[in-house]
Curated annotation (Swiss-Prot):
Annotated protein name in UniProt: Tryptophan synthase alpha chain
Keyword Nucleotide-binding: no
Quaternary assembly: Tetramer of two alpha and two beta chains.
Record flagged with keyword DNA repair: no
EC code: 4.2.1.20
Broad EC category: lyase
Gene Ontology terms, MF aspect: tryptophan synthase activity
Pathway listed: Amino-acid biosynthesis; L-tryptophan biosynthesis; L-tryptophan from chorismate: step 5/5
Keywords recorded for this protein, A-Z: Amino-acid biosynthesis, Aromatic amino acid biosynthesis, Lyase, Tryptophan biosynthesis
Length: 273
């Protein structure tokens, strides 16, 4: 028996449960090891205990092309704290042991996967209990070697549906992806300063036509109203990265304040689903 069913199974079970509740998913993103490996685990606990439906986690990387200054700051703090890929896999295994039902996704860059060897990376991810991997700088057209390794290890390959994608690309994303579809609300770098407008109904209806995995809207999701709007437009939920990481940046030297602020933010975002 392969593990494939169990891994996308966590996403399917989560989306099915949310559907019966008439709600969408709130999925926060953080960089593993930011601001330190020990505090990173407490941050993840806080997110999950305050309503996160799934997690999107990054490995620290010093040259993130798609990331704005906030996420770059997270990468640099994590690297400065000595977070290695091995430490990331150890953190992931701890999170998985604590939350057996929780979908855990990785969002990272191809260099990190190549550095390990593609197959070895996915094998380690599987051992740590990871459900999905999205490689931000590999478009679906070039993804075959990664997807094959992912599927061989029971991990869902996740693809980005860009806001300017044509039908052909959306069809390919829909056919190639498993778990969920990462829907960009706008092109550009991640960040919260530009509001995520949601003229995404058209893309959402195309994805539905192509029977894509459930779409989660990401990029620029920083307040509850945007979560509500995304779900109203037909998304299965929303991913928020920079807004979460901004809280870590602001309170990185005051653990109590940091965890309290993250708890408040997560509850407010989840309430909007």
């Amino acid at each position: 028996m392969s593990d494939t069913s169990t891994n996308t199974g966590r996403y399917q079970a989560t989306f099915a449960k949310l559907k019966t509740e008439g709600r969408g998913a709130f999925v926060p993103f953080v960089t593993l090891g930011d601001p330190s490996p020990v505090l990173s685990l407490k941050i993840i606990d806080t997110l999950v205990q305050n309503g996160a439906d799934a997690l999107e986690l990054g490995f620290p990387f010093s040259d993130p092309l798609a990331d704005g200054p906030v996420i770059q700051g997270a990468n640099l703090r994590s690297l400065a704290a000595g977070t290695t890929p091995t430490a990331c896999f150890e953190l992931l295994a701890q999170v998985r042991a604590k939350y057996p039902e929780l979908p855990i996704g990785l969002l990272l860059y191809a260099n990190l996967v190549f550095a390990n060897g593609i197959d070895a990376f996915y094998a380690k991810a599987q051992q740590a209990g990871v459900d999905s991997v999205l490689i931000a700088d590999v478009p679906v057209e070039e993804s075959a070697p990664f997807s094959e390794a992912a599927k061989a290890h029971g991990i869902a390959p996740i693809f980005i549906a860009p806001p300017n994608a044509d039908s052909e690309t959306l069809a390919l994303v829909s056919a190639s992806g498993e778990g969920y579809t990462y829907l960009l609300s706008r092109a550009g770098v991640t960040g919260t300063d530009t509001k995520a407008g949601v003229p995404v109904e058209e893309i959402l209806s195309k994805l539905k036509t192509f029977n894509a995995p459930p779409p989660l809207l990401g990029f620029g999701i920083a307040e509850p109203a945007q979560v509500t709007a995304a779900i109203k437009a037909g998304a299965a939920g929303a991913i928020s990265g920079s807004a979460v990481v901004k809280i870590i940046e602001t309170h990185q030297h005051d653990e109590a304040k940091l965890l309290a602020a993250l708890g408040d933010f997560t509850r407010a975002m989840k309430a909007a689903t």
